[in-house]
């Protein structure tokens, strides 16, 4: 008999005892069986009957999704799921007297913290209580395309008022997350403008070090609206100069941009949620996630510094201490803070307007009270290469230039985005890549916008950032500033469709994506 599982309990600022954080890489994914149908079923016979209708098709689809084989295991579909995500309407009290109605997971924003063990298969239940089909993307995991949760990769969707169950093997270890991958276009009640996101932490197999608290903090913005003002990138000391491409400029003015009224960390505006409680002498491990639809952010903890140990869930070769973290949309940073400065402090964005509208959280030492303090951090450029090493990287077997372009939408219009001169075309033949072959992707940003670009179902290694060679830094999102280049190497680990796109929702919706097919 199949039962719906109890919903995980959401924790606004979860704290845990010491956990192991070592990583191992690239075990093979096995899709056992998937079924898209209404539930619950009252008997095993009814369930298996439903699985026959939906499961046979999905089993075939999984088999072609690059998993390296799949097996039918009816027993795996019985009993409670290991992970349940219920998609539905959520009311979020973000500030005193200010509530947001949105769509989220399991009745909360962020959704439940999902802790999994690397390489241990789990049964996942996705339950959609809304009137529209949904896509659930396991960001940063190496899984078959059919389970990756995108329309472009022909992934399985969760039908309106329906249910989807499948098996997946979590990998690789580290901080990942799960979020909707619906393309909302200008509908700000759908897609990543909503509260459909949750941390996924895949437990590694060995201990990364000592810490006293572990905190998961996700940033998000609310109440988006269209405007004509284009936000310019701030001047950052130490950042190489931008070099706009030669030739005539677009005669049309810039199109619509998106702005927000409210900013939150873990669904609460600064000063409204409970403070983070710490003690002097503690080592606190922070897992940060930029869960914004469109905004790149910076974060600082007044009176303290961050020891960065992982980027996008992957340990860095050379941990470094920094004053400010920068996260493009969908980037994650793991950093340890040594609590050596007793007081009541603000952890938040250096941008005063955004901080005053909520982007921050209070950090309070034991036996300390009073108004939280903010101290502006020094202005320095974020440099990925400081976390890399100097070893030589293997030469790529093929180099693929990817030139990012922009076509201004004009007043009252929407900008269009291109890769190598073309916007995304769902009817175009995907670019073929060979499994196991090392490719160098050259991200050549010829626009004045910063682009957090994301490659699905793989991590890539940074090899050159704004003219500085580097190696050893593995990521799945990298922020390419305006008029600059970043080079990365990737060796596709799984066959099947593989999506590349800008994680800025507005850019992705209006053309900034490309589909590969790994064979």
Language model features by range: what are they?
Residues 1-42, 53:
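N-terminal secretory signal peptides
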Residues 50, 58, 63-84, 187, ...:
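Extended terminal and domain-junction accessory segments
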Residues 97-115, 265-276, 411-435:
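N-terminal edge beta-strand
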Residues 109, 113-114, 140-172, 271-276, ...:
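Extracytoplasmic beta-sandwich strand-turn segments characteristic of Greek-key/jelly-roll folds
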Residues 126-130, 290, 443-447:
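Asparagine-centered strand-capping/turn motif at beta-strand->loop junctions
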Residues 162, 166-203:
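Hydrophobic or amphipathic alpha-helical targeting/insertion segments
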Residues 213-282, 289-292, 415-418, 422:
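Acidic-aromatic/histidine active-site loop/patch
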Residues 302-315, 420, 446-473, 505-509, ...:
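Active/binding-pocket-proximal capping segment
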């Amino acid at each position: 008999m199949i039962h719906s599982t109890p919903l995980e309990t959401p924790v606004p600022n979860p704290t845990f005892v010491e956990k192991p954080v070592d990583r191992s890489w690239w075990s093979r994914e096995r899709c056992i069986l998937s079924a898209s149908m209404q539930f619950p079923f009252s008997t095993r016979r009814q369930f298996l009957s439903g699985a026959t209708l939906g499961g046979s098709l999905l089993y075939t689809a999984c088999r072609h999704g690059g998993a390296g084989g799949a097996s039918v295991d009816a027993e795996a579909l019985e009993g409670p799921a290991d992970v349940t995500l219920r998609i539905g309407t959520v009311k979020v009290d973000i500030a005193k007297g200010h509530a947001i109605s949105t769509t989220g997971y399991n009745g909360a924003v962020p959704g439940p913290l999902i802790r999994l063990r690397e390489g241990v298969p789990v049964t996942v239940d996705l339950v959609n209580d809304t009137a529209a089909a949904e896509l659930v993307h396991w960001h940063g995991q190496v899984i078959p395309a059919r389970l990756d949760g995108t329309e472009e990769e022909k992934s399985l969707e969760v039908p309106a008022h329906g249910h989807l169950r499948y098996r997946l093997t979590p990998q690789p270890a580290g901080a990942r997350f799960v979020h909707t991958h619906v393309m909302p276009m200008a509908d700000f009640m759908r897609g990543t403008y909503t509260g459909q996101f949750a941390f996924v932490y895949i437990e590694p197999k060995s201990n990364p070090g000592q810490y006293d608290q572990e905190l998961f903090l996700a940033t998000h913005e609310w109440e988006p609206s269209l405007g004509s003002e284009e936000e310019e990138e701030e001047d950052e000391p130490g950042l190489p100069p931008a070099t706009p491409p030669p030739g005539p400029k677009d005669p049309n003015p810039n199109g619509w941009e998106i702005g927000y009224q409210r900013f939150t960390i873990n669904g609460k505006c600064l000063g409204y949620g409970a403070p983070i409680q710490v003690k002097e002498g503690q080592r606190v491990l922070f897992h940060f996630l930029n869960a914004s639809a469109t905004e790149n952010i910076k974060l600082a903890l007044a009176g303290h510094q961050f020891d960065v140990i992982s980027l996008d869930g992957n340990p860095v070769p050379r941990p470094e201490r920094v004053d400010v973290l920068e996260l493009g949309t969908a980037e994650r940073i793991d950093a340890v803070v040594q609590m050596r400065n007793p007081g009541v402090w603000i952890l938040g964005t250096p941008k005063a307007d955004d901080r005053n509208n909520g982007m921050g959280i209070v950090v309070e030492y034991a036996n300390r009270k009073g108004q939280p303090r903010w101290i502006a951090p020094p202005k320095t450029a974020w440099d990925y290469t400081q976390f890399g090493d100097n070893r030589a990287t293997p030469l790529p077997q093929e180099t693929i230039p990817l030139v990012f372009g922009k076509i201004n939408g004009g007043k009252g219009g929407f900008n269009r985005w291109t890769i190598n001169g073309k916007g995304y075309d769902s009817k175009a033949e995907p670019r073929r890549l060979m499994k196991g072959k090392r490719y160098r992707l050259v991200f050549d940003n010829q626009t004045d916008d910063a682009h957090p670009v994301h490659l699905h179902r793989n991590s890539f290694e940074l090899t050159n950032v704004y003219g500085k060679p580097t190696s050893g830094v593995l990521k799945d999102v990298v922020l390419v500033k305006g008029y600059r280049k970043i080079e990365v190497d990737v060796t596709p680990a799984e066959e099947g469709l593989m999506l590349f796109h800008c994680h800025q929702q507005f850019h992705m919706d209006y053309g900034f994506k490309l589909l590969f097919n790994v064979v």
